[in-house]
Amino acid sequence: LKVELIRLATEAGNRRDVDINFPFDATSTPAQVMERMEGLYQTTLAETQELLDPAQLDRAAKLIAKARQVDIYTGSHNLYPAGMFRDRLLSSGKSATCYSSTEAQVRTALASDSGNVAIVISYSGLAPNLKEILPILSSRHVPVIVIGTPYCARLHPGFAAYLTVSDHESMTHRIT
C-alpha cells in the first residue's frame, strides 16, 4: 500500500499544468510540444476517470451490445473520432452509422426504432442538429447515450446513459 501511495503521489507531482485551450504556440519547440501534449493527455485521462460513472459506462455498453444498429450523431471536430468508433463497431460485427450531414442524421433518426441505439456526442449540448434529432429519437423510443459535459447532461435529462467528460475546454477560445 505504501509503495502504491508513493507511486501515485509521484505521478501526480509529475503532471505539468498545461493550458487545455492553448497547450503550445508558434514559439514552442518540438520537445515542448511533446511535453505539453503528454501533460494534456495525462490531465484529460485523470479528469475523465474522475467524471466517468462506471455504472453509466456499463449501461451504455449493454445498450450497444444488444442494439440491432448503433447510430452516432455528432458534428464538427467530433466527426473523426466518432467515425473511428463506428469503424470499430463495424469491425466487431455491429451495424453502425455516423453521417456528417444533418439531413442524413435526421433521416437516420426517422428510420430508427427501439432496436437502434443512438450515441449523441456534444460536449456543450448546444449542437444545432440536436434540436431536431433528439425529439425524433425520443418519439421513436430510441435509447440515447449522451457523451458530453455535466452541463450537457443537465440540459438534456432523461436519456438512457450519460458518459460525462471534462468541461474545462473553452468552446470559443481554443486550438481546434
Regions found by a protein language model. Give the residues of each.
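Short helix-to-loop capping/linker segments positioned immediately adjacent to catalytic or ligand/cofactor-binding
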Residues: T48-L52, A60, I72-Y73
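Amphipathic, non-membrane alpha-helical segments in soluble helical-bundle scaffolds
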Residues: A31-E35, A127, T176
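Glycine-rich phosphate-binding loops that contact phosphosugars or nucleotide phosphates
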Residues: A65-I175
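HTH-adjacent hinge/linker in prokaryotic transcriptional regulators
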Residues: L1-A55
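Short, flexible segments with low predicted structural confidence
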Residues: D17, E35-R36, A60-A61, T108-A109
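Glycine-rich phosphate/diphosphate-binding loops that line cofactor/substrate pockets in enzymes
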Residues: A55-R68
